[in-house]
């Protein structure tokens, strides 16, 4: 069994070794199913802010952080967004919850 890394982005393809999610709803499903598949846990969530045309399927990616907070989940997070305001908003959620941000 291995730890899973999740890449959440609508445009940039996932690096090798990552599960690529393009929507918030897809990422939620992957996270909820992690116990049922081949992984022992989630090593990292590498996340963009802007979901582009995929926003209709769960909102911009910051909504995933809101959901993680609501459900009490805690995983290391890396933000790879080019949106400086979005990055700061995501960092506030990460810091408020005491989550680990990988830079």
Explain the meaning of each model-derived region.
Residues 1-103:
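Catalytic phosphate/metal-binding cores of nucleic-acid and nucleotide-processing enzymes, i.e., regions
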């Amino acid at each position: 069994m291995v730890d899973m890394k999740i890449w959440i982005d609508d445009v940039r393809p996932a690096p090798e070794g990552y599960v690529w999610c393009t929507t918030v709803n897809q990422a939620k499903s992957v996270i909820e199913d992690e116990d049922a598949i081949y992984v022992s846990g989630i090593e990292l969530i590498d996340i963009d802010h802007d979901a582009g045309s995929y926003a209709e399927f769960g909102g911009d990616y910051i909504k995933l952080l809101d959901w993680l907070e609501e459900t009490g989940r805690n995983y290391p997070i890396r933000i790879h967004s080019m949106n400086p305001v979005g990055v700061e908003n995501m960092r506030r959620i990460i810091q408020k919850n005491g989550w680990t941000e990988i830079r």
